[in-house]
């Protein structure tokens, strides 16, 4: 007994199905096929041979008709019929030889796009109707005018408007173009009398057309219950962006760049491939330099090759071939402004004009528009920056940056000061290099980009790179391991020469808080990483003294006192604070022989400070600076203690003529305010105002920073 294989394609699904009938091929009828499938609501088309046209798809509706056989098997296509709807089918009425298109590829990328993608969307010919799936909704809307019913049972409201209201214009004439624009440009809605799985695209075309192919969209989505919401939202986003006709063409000059710099994402579903999208954009590539193409955009055409009816694999292959050829590349993309993109794209972000992705905005759109978000803020504020401040603060930040009016003729220090300011847009943050944390570092390529876009006078990026190299040679920026050649791939920190200037812009920050927004001198560790111990742990104030031995010295902040405090830590750890001899303390007060009584008081608090501050951070950079720096540190601390005692004799909380660093409310606390801040807190004034007696503290800092690589290992 013979056996017949029947291969059938169901709707637009790309993979065919196979059934076997225990009958010889010449005896198989449509009734036998239907008995196996049990799908009464489908129309059956079979591959057959026509004398005039050759191989065609022939519809067979007679159950007793023999099925055409090729090479011992039957090839069939099943298309959803309109069995659940009262309207008769509009197809195959005029010319039975004109058949629907092959479902092998029409269920692919074309189905996921609205009619605005297709050049024949406005045509009304019979050829367009039968051969183009997307055209069907427009043309059949005009052919079905006599059969439309506007009764109450069909007037379900969509977004406050009944179907009947949408179907006709005041003059009584149908306008399918008005219908499409009014429904597809609204936000997502669902037809209340249809299945919940019907998306916006299918519901709008459903009522504008009674055609068989558009009902196929609806039935297809009913089968995809699991991923229905995700897919319909994706389709509606494509519909929105393309109905606004925001399609741009970008020509990229590949001579200046080594690579295109995009990753692409292919969208596929049961109906086939759904298009090629921009997944991410890499810095340094041609696309990132242009700035107009963004993640989530749909790639429609490359050079003269259209991706519309091409599978994802073919599109990727063509794109690779084009990239390897010399010459410019022209990309045509559809901008996708979906506020909630699919998971394969980057996270949703925002921009002042329209919703896009803020990380992409920072990397390339900011370079084109000139709006920069704030960086280098404390962790508690960084979350605000990533969401709302891109809208609220970008304009003021830009205005503040524009106040500098920087050019290549400006003072180099002024340019570095603007670059170091928090609102400059330069990404300064802690970075990891060989498992070493580099605090407040930035990439060389970011410096070049910042100079090129914010300093006037550069004709090309190469000149901006030369300027960055000069900044390195002049000491305004420093390599983390003291390399003198500039590279865009290396991490850099601000040098000693610009450390002061960076802090001048931070004078409004309160240095007495437990964590500071910016480091005083790079490369100090970020103070917010761990709490710092109090410099004065005792619960009683230092004993008052009738006079201030140093009335002219300003108060000491820890911007330059941090090094000396660290020296005290290490000194105390070596001599184990509690067993310190009196001779050590006499060394400290010998240079000041005139104040023997105050020397004893200072030594006592000095001894207490050294004993209490030994901990995990004892080893500081100044420990390597040698005995000389430690000796200077004693004198620095002596002045610090004397200055602290002056708080109890002067109600103004500071020396005469010098405004206090911190407000009186902070000084009411038991520990002296100058000792409250961590070693990384910003200073109150420039290092140049430090008295000559304390210049050794500044030298100990610079000696410690002479070998930053060891310093970073020490901090970890």
From Swiss-Prot:
Primary site of residence: cytoplasm
Modified residues (Asymmetric dimethylarginine): 271
Tissue distribution of the protein: Ubiquitous.
Protein name stated in the entry: Segment polarity protein dishevelled homolog DVL-3
Residues annotated as domain DEP: 422-496
PANTHER family in alphabetical order: SEGMENT POLARITY PROTEIN DISHEVELLED, SEGMENT POLARITY PROTEIN DISHEVELLED HOMOLOG DVL-3
Skewed-composition ranges (Pro residues): 653-663, 670-682
PTM section of the record: Ubiquitinated. Deubiquitinated by CYLD, which acts on 'Lys-63'-linked ubiquitin chains.
UniProt domain DIX: residue ranges: 1-82
Compositional bias (Basic residues): 213-226
One of the Pfam families matching this protein, by short name: DEP
Function: Involved in the signal transduction pathway mediated by multiple Wnt genes.
Modification sites for Phosphoserine: 48, 125, 192, 697, 700
Gene name as annotated: Dvl3
Composition bias type Basic and acidic residues, residue spans: 142-156, 582-595, 604-622
Residue positions where Phosphothreonine is found in the record: 346
Subcellular location(s) of the protein: Cytoplasm
Gene Ontology cellular-component terms listed: cytoplasm; glutamatergic synapse; synapse; Wnt signalosome
Family named by the database record: Belongs to the DSH family.
GO molecular function annotation: protein-macromolecule adaptor activity
């Amino acid at each position: 007994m013979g056996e017949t294989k029947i291969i059938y394609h169901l709707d637009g699904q790309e993979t065919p199905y196979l059934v076997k009938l225990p009958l010889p091929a010449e005896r198989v009828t449509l009734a036998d096929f239907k008995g196996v499938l049990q799908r009464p609501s489908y129309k059956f088309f079979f591959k057959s041979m026509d004398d005039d046209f050759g191989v065609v798809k022939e519809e067979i509706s007679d159950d007793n008709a023999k099925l055409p056989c090729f090479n011992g098997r039957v090839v069939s296509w099943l298309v959803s019929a309109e069995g659940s709807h009262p309207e008769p089918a509009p197809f195959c009425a005029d010319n039975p030889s004109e058949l629907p298109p092959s479902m092998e590829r029409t269920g692919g990328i074309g189905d996921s796009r609205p009619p605005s993608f297709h050049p024949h969307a406005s045509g009304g010919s019979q050829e367009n109707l039968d051969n183009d799936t997307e055209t069907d909704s427009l043309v059949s809307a005009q052919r079905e005018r006599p059969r439309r019913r506007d009764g109450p049972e069909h007037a379900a409201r969509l977004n406050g408007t009944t179907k009947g209201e949408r179907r006709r214009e005041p003059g009584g004439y149908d306008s399918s173009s008005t219908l499409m624009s009014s429904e597809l440009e609204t936000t997502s809605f669902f037809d209340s009398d249809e299945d919940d799985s019907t998306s916006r695209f299918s519901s709008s075309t459903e009522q504008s057309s009674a055609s068989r192919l558009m009902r196929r969209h609806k039935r297809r989505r009913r089968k995809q219950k699991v991923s229905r919401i995700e897919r319909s939202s994706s389709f509606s986003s494509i519909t929105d962006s393309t109905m606004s006709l925001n399609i741009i063409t970008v020509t990229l000059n590949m001579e200046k760049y080594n690579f295109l710099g995009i990753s692409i994402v292919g969208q596929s579903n049961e109906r086939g491939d759904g298009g090629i999208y921009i997944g991410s954009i890499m810095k340094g590539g041609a696309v990132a330099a242009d700035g107009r193409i963004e993640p989530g955009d749909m790639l429609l055409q490359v050079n003269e090759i259209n991706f519309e009816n091409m599978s994802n694999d073919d599109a990727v292959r063509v794109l690779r071939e084009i990239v390897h050829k010399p010459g410019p590349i022209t990309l045509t993309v559809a901008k996708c402004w979906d506020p909630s993109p699919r998971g394969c794209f980057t996270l949703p972000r925002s921009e002042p004009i329209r919703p896009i992705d803020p990380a992409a905005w920072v990397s390339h759109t900011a370079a084109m528009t000139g709006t920069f978000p704030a960086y280098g803020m404390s962790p508690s504020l960084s979350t605000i920056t990533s969401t709302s401040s891109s809208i609220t603060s970008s304009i003021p930040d830009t205005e503040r940056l524009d106040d500098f009016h920087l050019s290549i003729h400006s003072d180099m220090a002024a340019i570095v000061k603007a670059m170091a300011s928090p609102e400059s847009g330069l990404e300064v943050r802690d970075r990891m290099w060989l498992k070493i944390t580099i605090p407040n570092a930035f990439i060389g390529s970011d410096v070049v980009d910042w100079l090129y876009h914010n300093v006037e006078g550069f004709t090309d990026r190469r000149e901006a790179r030369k300027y960055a190299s000069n900044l390195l040679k002049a000491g305004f920026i420093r390599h983390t391991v003291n390399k003198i050649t500039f590279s865009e791939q290396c991490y850099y920190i601000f040098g000693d020469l610009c450390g002061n200037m960076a802090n001048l812009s931070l004078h409004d920050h309160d240095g007495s808080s437990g964590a500071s927004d910016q480091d005083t001198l790079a490369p100090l560790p970020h103070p917010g990483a761990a709490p710092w111990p109090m410099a004065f742990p005792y619960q009683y104030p230092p004993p008052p003294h009738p006079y201030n031995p140093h009335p002219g010295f300003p108060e000491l902040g820890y911007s330059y006192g941090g090094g000396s405090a660290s020296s005290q830590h290490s000194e105390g750890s070596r001599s184990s604070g509690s067993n310190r001899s009196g001779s050590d303390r006499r060394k400290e007060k010998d240079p000041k022989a005139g104040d023997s009584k105050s020397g004893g008081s200072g030594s006592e608090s000095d001894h207490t400070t050294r004993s209490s501050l030994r901990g995990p951070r004892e080893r500081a950079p100044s420990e390597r600076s040698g005995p000389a720096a430690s000796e200077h540190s004693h004198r620095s601390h002596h002045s610090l203690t004397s200055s602290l005692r002056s708080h109890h004799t002067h109600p103004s909380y500071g020396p005469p003529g010098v405004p206090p660093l911190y407000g009186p409310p902070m000084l009411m606390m038991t520990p002296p305010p100058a000792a409250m801040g961590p070693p990384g807190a910003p200073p109150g004034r420039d290092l140049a105002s430090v008295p000559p007696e304390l210049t050794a503290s500044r030298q100990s800092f610079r000696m410690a920073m002479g070998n930053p690589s060891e310093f970073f290992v020490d901090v970890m």
